[in-house]
Amino acid sequence: MIASLNFPALHASHSAIWFAHPGKPAVRISKGEAIARAAETPLIMLNAPLIAQRLGYPELSGLDLLELFAFVHPAQFMVPTPMGLVRALKLELPLPFRGGGNAPELALQSPLPTLSPKGERAEQGLPESSIPALLHAAAEALIATLERPDWPQREGAWTGLQALARLRWPWAGVASRHLKAPEKAERWLFSRLPEWEEQPPRPQPRQITLAENDAEAQLEALTGAGAERREGQRQFARTAAHIFAPREKRAEPHMLLAEAGTGIGKTLGYLAPASLWSHAAGGTVWISTYTKALQRQLSRETERIYADEAEFRKRVVIRKGRENYLCLLNLEDALQGGFQNRAAVLAQLVARWAAYSRDGDMIGGDLPGWLTTLFRRAGVTALTDRRGECVYAGCPHYRKCFIEHAARSSQNADLVIANHALVMVNAARAREQQGRPTRIIFDEGHHLHDAADSMFAVALTGQETVEMRRWVMGPEGKSRGRRRGLAARLSDVASYDELGGRAIEAARIAAEALPGEGWLARIREGAPSGEIEQLLAAIRGTVYARDESGAEDAGYGLETELAELDGPLIAAAMEAARAIHALHQPLVALGRRLEILIEDPPDWLDGPARARIEGAIASLGWRIDLLAAWASLLGRIGGPADPDFVDWLALDRVEGREYDM
């Protein structure tokens, strides 16, 4: 036994609570005893928040093996259960203690057989009384790994552990005794990550026509010689092959709307001609799905096409929206004080993961899904780019960005597995001109309308306007973090260019009309501030007035059509439109000025400043378009209807609590 691990272990299930000192048999205790012992000394446990929930004691803390596993084995899959821990660490399975006296025996089995990742079968038959001993064995195995010279995740561990020790991470004291300082100073995380390289544009694909027989032969190669012959699948592949034929007229691509019943095997039915065409023509085929589950299935299916792993990673790229990937600039801010207390511990563990992650995908990638559940406030959303704040080339980590890595990999891939939302975003914002898809297969096509509606629809809401204010003005009051306003992001322009500086200042003044912190409380109290809050208050009153369900206290959102509106609401909409226009004008002027500075650069415009301006132009254009859409929407309140749009008023609620309108 490792002397520094002389801590008791605790396991709580729905049926019992088991407690054990190292080398001692487990004893069954009550909830009150468990809480008292947790207050006396740190306890080794697995999934502390879950144990706290079962004990009914939310303040429970201790030595959580999941956190230690995330530190020792970052980016490694592990089911967060006792048996999942056994399998991940290749432990021998402890059976119940037997014998008596002061020296009980611990019977061990041989290593477990390989099971499915979920490990349901392995959980059966494991006595709960043996789990505390299992937790002790797992803790010893993890701590012993820190001393192994062949530990593959050693780099960065010492630096990370010192930071965690300053944060009083419960495991820091034990781990520090077993992790030696490196002989040479460790490299900073952001200097260790690989950079992507600019690649020449992929040549235009060759114009070829796929023969039906070739598509069928490719299907047979993918399904294997012993597979069942399904005529429906073969017909699907033969028909799908025709959409890859050369165009006959400009702007009229070949299209096919195909439906296949359950059991036809449509996935391989379209993968066969798609992979055949991409290989023969030297082009890229995008396969768009609606769900992450189908993305994962497609990734597994395409492994049949490229048996070699290196070739597979080169030829097949999975693309997701920006909000799925770790933003390195957000992570740097979190590591340098943007996160506090337990959130700061999460940031350090995410940094450990980032150094070894395959692609930086935080949602459905190799970041353990259970890691973020160990921390009360969800910090993951703050580590991704969910607000469109990316400054692109103006970011100091641009060359190492996970999102840019994926974008450039997809430009030379044969198959890109994306989702409807990303395809719609690229279609709407048209940022990735070089890698824009020219051949697209929409699987789960019945969801395509929802994805398009989500992207191309516009919503003038309290939360959206708050985000716009923050984007222009930056953090206000006690707000922390790297979020900066226009003046800070474009400090060079604000300082050295008179016209640009005026536009930035005018935008800042105009943005004060948008809702700020506490807007929802002010509206509820009947004291809205500014033109937009006045409009939102009028909308709220109208929605409640027209609700005929009598369910004002129900937990569901409320809606009403935008028709037969009263005078005060129309007047509030006109005032709000003027406020939106007042912000739109200086942003348009700023956009024009930035383009002039790029075309005719002044002496002060060095490389970094140019990169910041180019990044700002992209995000500025998006905000200008959004403001114009808001103005158009407000113009239809009390004005003529537009047959191309369906407009309505809504109050968003969850469990009876209003959160937007």
Please state what every model-predicted region is:
Residues 205-258, 661:
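Conserved pre-motif I regulatory segment
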